[in-house]
């Protein structure tokens, strides 16, 4: 079974697939945070206009930017997301049993749901703040 036949989220378990996301990555040879080392630490490159070096762990969804050439991706990952289960996996994706993989992917799915829920809550709170402000302005105008 080829990597392309895997669901997109599962393709990210393959280091080569993660490496392929590092197009226009500013740190190449002579740096600690090369695309290969970033992918080894679980990161994918997801740049934005304002954050060209934004990288996100595909597993815990922690986003880090402001990379320096000497930053060690695994150490930075541990420092900012020490509970990421991906960091404790000692086998390659292809070596995991089905049971091990499904248990691991269940953790990734829980992380994704938590991240999305947190984002929606922030969005709701921002909207509620704007609505409250508009209501207060209406009340003050009376």
UniProtKB/Swiss-Prot annotation:
Locations listed in the record: Cytoplasm; Nucleus; Chromosome; Chromosome, Centromere
Broad class of where this protein is predominantly found: cytoplasm
GO molecular function: cysteine-type endopeptidase inhibitor activity; cysteine-type endopeptidase inhibitor activity involved in apoptotic process; microtubule binding; protein homodimerization activity; tubulin binding; zinc ion binding
Residue numbers of Phosphothreonine PTMs: 34, 48, 117
Keyword Signal: no
Modified residues (Phosphoserine): 20
Keywords carried by this UniProt record: Acetylation, Apoptosis, Cell cycle, Cell division, Centromere, Chromosome, Chromosome partition, Cytoplasm, Cytoskeleton, Kinetochore, Metal-binding, Microtubule, Mitosis, Nucleus, Phosphoprotein, Protease inhibitor, Repressor, Thiol protease inhibitor, Transcription, Transcription regulation, Ubl conjugation, Zinc
Modification comment: Ubiquitinated by the Cul9-RING ubiquitin-protein ligase complex, leading to its degradation. Ubiquitination is required for centrosomal targeting. Deubiquitinated by USP35 or USP38; leading to stabilization. Acetylation at Lys-129 results in its homodimerization, while deacetylation promotes the formation of monomers which heterodimerize with XPO1/CRM1 which facilitates its nuclear export. The acetylated form represses STAT3 transactivation. The dynamic equilibrium between its acetylation and deacetylation at Lys-129 determines its interaction with XPO1/CRM1, its subsequent subcellular localization, and its ability to inhibit STAT3 transactivation.
Top-level taxon of origin: Eukaryota
InterPro entries: Baculoviral_IAP, BIR_rpt
Site (Interaction with FBXL7): 126
Listed CDD domains: BIR
Residues carrying N6-acetyllysine: 23, 90, 110, 112, 115, 129
Entry binding sites for Zn(2+): 57, 60, 77, 84
One GO-annotated biological process of the protein: G2/M transition of mitotic cell cycle
Segments annotated as BIR repeats: 18-88
GO cellular component: centriole; chromosome passenger complex; chromosome, centromeric region; cytoplasm; cytoplasmic microtubule; cytosol; interphase microtubule organizing center; kinetochore
Subunit structure as annotated in this protein's UniProt entry: Monomer or homodimer. Exists as a homodimer in the apo state and as a monomer in the CPC-bound state. The monomer protects cells against apoptosis more efficiently than the dimer. Only the dimeric form is capable of enhancing tubulin stability in cells. When phosphorylated, interacts with LAMTOR5/HBXIP; the resulting complex binds pro-CASP9, as well as active CASP9, but much less efficiently.
Record text about domains: The BIR repeat is necessary and sufficient for LAMTOR5 binding.
Function as written in the Swiss-Prot or TrEMBL entry: Multitasking protein that has dual roles in promoting cell proliferation and preventing apoptosis. Component of a chromosome passage protein complex (CPC) which is essential for chromosome alignment and segregation during mitosis and cytokinesis. Acts as an important regulator of the localization of this complex; directs CPC movement to different locations from the inner centromere during prometaphase to midbody during cytokinesis and participates in the organization of the center spindle by associating with polymerized microtubules.
Family: Belongs to the IAP family.
Name of protein: Baculoviral IAP repeat-containing protein 5
Chain's gene name: BIRC5
């Amino acid at each position: 079974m080829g990597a392309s036949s895997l669901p997109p989220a599962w393709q990210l378990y393959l280091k080569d697939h993660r490496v392929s996301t590092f197009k226009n990555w500013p740190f190449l040879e002579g740096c600690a945070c090369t695309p290969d080392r970033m992918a080894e630490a679980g990161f994918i490159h997801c740049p934005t206009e304002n954050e060209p070096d934004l990288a996100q762990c595909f597993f815990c969804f922690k986003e880090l930017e402001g990379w320096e050439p000497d930053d060690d991706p695994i150490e930075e990952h541990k420092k900012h997301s020490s509970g990421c289960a991906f960091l404790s996996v000692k086998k390659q994706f292809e070596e995991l049993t089905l049971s091990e993989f499904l248990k691991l992917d269940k953790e990734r799915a829980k992380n994704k749901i938590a991240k999305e829920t947190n984002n929606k809550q922030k969005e709701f709170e921002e909207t509620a703040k704007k609505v409250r402000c508009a209501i207060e302005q209406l009340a003050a105008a009376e």
